[in-house]
Design a protein with these regions (language model features):
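Extracellular/periplasmic carbohydrate-active domains that bind, remodel
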Residues: 1-232
């Protein structure tokens, strides 16, 4: 439905009150995903629901992996809004026990390998990096407003290579999640974060610009970020 709506010029997909179960959702240009009050989207804890691998960035290194519960690549004018909840799978799902790589990411990935060959999809014994909750990459004009993120598998809100991002009035609850960062901005430009409440067991806010040799290769800083009126 999202792709069809985008091809028609855009619009709003409304998730009504109730509990909904989903694998990865991909936002497309000119589409708003709005969660009504009382709507809960619980995302899958199965590796197969995050296939095929998509272009993403894990801990500052470009890979092909799970991406995020809600993902976008190369989209413009996208929004995730409303008073509903984005929720990860139950705390006892096997995916939560997967090692998030064999070691730190720079020891897992051969930087000489083309990015399209850096496959981290959890298949055939390959590394699996758990999906973030919301991670648009290479997007322009991104709005995240009002929603609550709970029980993440990894970082919650992680724009990458994005321009003109507004994150307003969101709530993050991830105190029991290892590496359950709140809002991580990675190589983005023109970002406003305001009126948000973050309760995290790891970093509440981070500003990133790539890691080690891969970060130097990409050479994209994070710039012009304003964080104000938040509780963390």
């Amino acid at each position: 439905k999202i792709e069809r709506l985008s091809k028609r010029g855009g619009g709003t997909v409304v998730v009504p009150a109730g509990k909904w179960y989903s694998g990865r959702i991909e936002l497309k240009s000119n589409v708003e995903l709005r969660l009504d009050e009382g709507a809960v989207i619980e995302f899958s804890g199965e590796v197969d629901d995050y296939q095929p691998a998509v272009f993403t960035r894990h801990e500052g290194v470009e890979v092909m992996g799970a991406g995020a519960f809600i993902y976008a690549n190369g989209a413009k004018n996208i929004a995730l809004t409303g008073k509903g909840v984005i929720m990860g799978p139950p705390m006892d799902v096997p995916m939560r026990k997967f090692p998030n790589g064999k070691s730190v990411v720079e020891n897992d990935i051969d930087y000489r390998m083309p990015v399209k060959e850096r496959l981290c999809d959890g298949k055939e014994g390959r590394t699996f990096y758990r999906p973030k909750s919301f991670s648009p990459i290479n997007c322009k004009n991104v709005l995240v407003e009002g929603v609550t993120f709970e029980r993440s598998l990894l970082w919650n809100v992680n724009p990458v290579y994005c321009e003109n991002v507004i994150i307003r009035g969101v709530t993050v609850n991830s105190t029991d999640v290892p590496s359950g960062d709140g809002i991580d901005i990675s190589s983005c430009k023109n970002v406003l974060i305001e009126y948000s409440t973050l309760n995290c067991g790891d970093d509440c806010f981070t500003l990133k610009a790539g890691r080690c040799e891969d970060g130097l290769r990409v050479n994209r800083p994070t710039e012009n970020v304003l964080i104000r009126y938040c509780l963390a």
